[in-house]
Structures are given as C-alpha cells and as structure tokens.
Regions:
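Short Pro/Gly-enriched coil loops immediately N-terminal to beta-strands
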Residues: 15-31, 39-47, 126-135
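Secondary-structure junction motif
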Residues: 50-75, 145-154, 159-164
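Short beta-strand and adjacent tight-turn residues that come in two discontinuous sequence segments
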Residues: 1-7, 86-88, 105-107, 111
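A late-sequence structural motif
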Residues: 101, 121-166
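Short beta-strand-to-loop elements that line the ligand-binding cleft
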Residues: 7-8, 53-54, 75-89
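Residues embedded in well-ordered beta-strands
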Residues: 26-28, 34, 52, 103, ...
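Short beta-strand-centered segments that line the small-molecule binding cleft or hinge
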Residues: 1-29, 93, 98-101, 121-124
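Short secondary-structure boundary segments
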Residues: 8-9, 31, 57-58, 108-110, ...
Length: 167
C-alpha cells in the first residue's frame, strides 16, 4: 500500500499524514421512527434506543463511543444507550436500520448516500456541537512518488463530497 485514506487521530513512525476534510456524525433512522419528528437530536434522545454499531476493533466504532459517552459498553453497565447489534460495514448498518432493527450514528457523507439510495431512511443532525472526524491521507516518508500523493490530494479536494468540509 502506497497511500491510504484514514480517520484521525493516526500516528505511526515514518508515516506522513495530511488532513483532507472534516465530517460531522449524524443519526440514521427509519422514516417512521419517533425521532424522525425531531429537527435535531440531543444525546439524551438516544437513551434506551438500540443503537447499531460497527464491530469491535473498527475505528469508527471507537469514534462513536468517544462521541457518545452514554453508549453501553462492557465497562459501563450504567450507560443508558444500548448497543445490542453490530454490523460488519457501514452498508450493513444502513440495511439494518432500513429493516427496523435500530438506529445508527454515521459519518454524514455515508448517511446522505444511504438516504439517497433508500427512501425509507432519514438523517438527523445532533444538536449543538456535533461529533465529527477528520479524514486524512497517510503515506510512508520513504515513498518516492510525492507528485502522485499531491495529485491524489488535489483530486480528492477538488471533488464534492456531501456532508464534508475541507480541513
């Protein structure tokens, strides 16, 4: 692998990292879900909801857990947000939400895409300062093709990715 897209934070020796864009997290819900009547979602609105998550070891799962301190984890039995079901990919989580198995938190670009592909889905932003992540390019310091990295960065930054803002 020469160059990767990765969510920050990411720190490895001899790896260069260049932020590309920031992206808010939003809630993906079925159109008929009670939370669909709300314009914005408070974190307390998720209390006692079945929030579908990525499986253990996935960086996005860790980002959601950090953003939602009430998420029910093994080390936090008092948490009020339940996570009973896990998916292996963002696409799987979208299908699970469309099937009525629960709700999920997604990067906004993924949630917009899911909503555009499936009219049974809705997205809602979080109230106040929304949880977010930064996506970056990363490559080895010894990688000799710097112009290739520059061309990739330029191509990504010149494209329109709904739900993101350039870093």
């Amino acid at each position: 692998v020469d160059v990767i897209l990765i969510s920050l934070p990411f720190s490895e020796p001899d790896i260069l990292v260049q932020p590309l864009y920031d992206e808010s997290f939003v809630l993906l819900i079925p159109k008929n879900h009670p939370l669909a009547t709300k314009k914005e979602i408070e974190q307390t609105d998720l209390d006692n909801e079945n929030v579908l998550m990525m499986g253990e070891g996935h960086c996005f799962r860790d980002q959601v857990i950090e953003a939602l301190p009430n998420i029910n984890r093994n080390d936090s039995p008092q948490a009020s947000i339940r996570t009973m079901t896990e998916g292996s990919s963002i696409e799987t989580l979208c299908h699970m939400v469309a099937s009525g198995l629960g709700i999920t938190v997604l990067p906004e670009s993924a949630a917009i895409g899911a909503r555009e592909r499936n009219s049974a889905l809705e997205t809602r932003p979080f109230a106040g300062l929304s949880p977010s992540r930064t996506t970056a390019l990363a490559w080895r310091t010894s990688f000799p093709r710097h112009k290739a990295v520059d061309a990739l960065r330029t191509a990504i930054l010149s494209s329109t990715l709904n739900g993101t803002t350039k870093s």
